[in-house]
């Protein structure tokens, strides 16, 4: 059937503002809209994001590195200052003590060996408590088990 002539056609009432604004197309999730690039010719090449390791990976890498080396871990000058400061408490004020570098080096080697062994025992205490994180109570237990002098257990 053909449309009737002279009839009134119905049209939707639309405001002028709504008709003027085009509807934006929705971007699918996971995609970003491309922006006009602000990079000009001759600019340096942008560096990519710095590599992010999983938690614990770098710690294991450091552990392997420290186990491989035999270097001293505490800086020499601060350790020497500490040794001199402690020694001053046992001497009269008018007497000055002189230290050979080999004597301070021997003290530092012994101190670091003591600390390494203490942390090994502390780690064993933490593992015994079914933990991987060492705590103050683990250090206290390790020192208590070692005894008064707390010497290296392997000597």
UniProtKB/Swiss-Prot annotation:
Keywords: Centromere, Chromosome, DNA-binding, Nucleosome core, Nucleus, Ubl conjugation
Low complexity: compositionally biased ranges: 1-24
GO MF annotations in UniProt: centromeric DNA binding; protein heterodimerization activity; structural constituent of chromatin
PANTHER family (UniProt xref): HISTONE H3-LIKE CENTROMERIC PROTEIN A, HISTONE H3.2
Lineage: superkingdom: Eukaryota
One GO BP: mitotic sister chromatid segregation
PTM annotation, UniProt: Ubiquitinated. Is degraded through ubiquitin-mediated proteolysis when not protected by its association to the kinetochore.
Disordered: annotated span: 1-56
GO cellular component: 2-micrometer circle DNA; CENP-A containing nucleosome; kinetochore; nucleus; peroxisome
Xref: Pfam families: Histone (PF00125)
Subunit structure: Component of centromeric nucleosomes, where DNA is wrapped around a histone octamer core. The octamer contains two molecules each of H2A, H2B, hH3v/CENPA and H4 assembled in one hH3v-H4 heterotetramer and two H2A-H2B heterodimers. Interacts with the inner kinetochore.
Spans annotated as H3-like: 45-148
Protein family membership: Belongs to the histone H3 family.
Main localization, broad class: nucleus
Protein name, UniProt field: Histone H3-like centromeric protein hH3v
Protein's job: Histone H3-like nucleosomal protein that is specifically found in centromeric nucleosomes. Replaces conventional H3 in the nucleosome core of centromeric chromatin that serves as an assembly site for the inner kinetochore. Required for recruitment and assembly of kinetochore proteins, mitotic progression and chromosome segregation. May serve as an epigenetic mark that propagates centromere identity through replication and cell division.
């Amino acid at each position: 059937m053909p449309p009737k002539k002279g009839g009134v056609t119905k049209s939707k009432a639309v405001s002028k503002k709504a008709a003027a604004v085009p509807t934006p197309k929705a971007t699918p999730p996971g995609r970003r809209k491309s922006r006009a690039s602000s990079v000009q010719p001759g600019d340096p090449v942008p560096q990519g994001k710095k590599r992010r390791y999983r938690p614990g990976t770098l710690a294991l890498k450091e552990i392997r590195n420290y186990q491989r080396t035999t270097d001293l871990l505490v800086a020499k000058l601060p350790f020497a200052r500490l040794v001199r400061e402690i020694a001053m408490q046992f001497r009269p004020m008018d007497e000055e003590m002189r230290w050979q570098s080999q004597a301070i080096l021997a003290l530092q080697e012994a101190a670091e060996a003591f600390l390494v062994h203490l942390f090994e025992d502390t780690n064993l205490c933490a593992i015994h408590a079914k933990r991987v994180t060492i705590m103050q109570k683990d250090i206290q237990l390790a020192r208590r088990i070692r005894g008064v002098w707390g010497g290296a257990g392997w000597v």
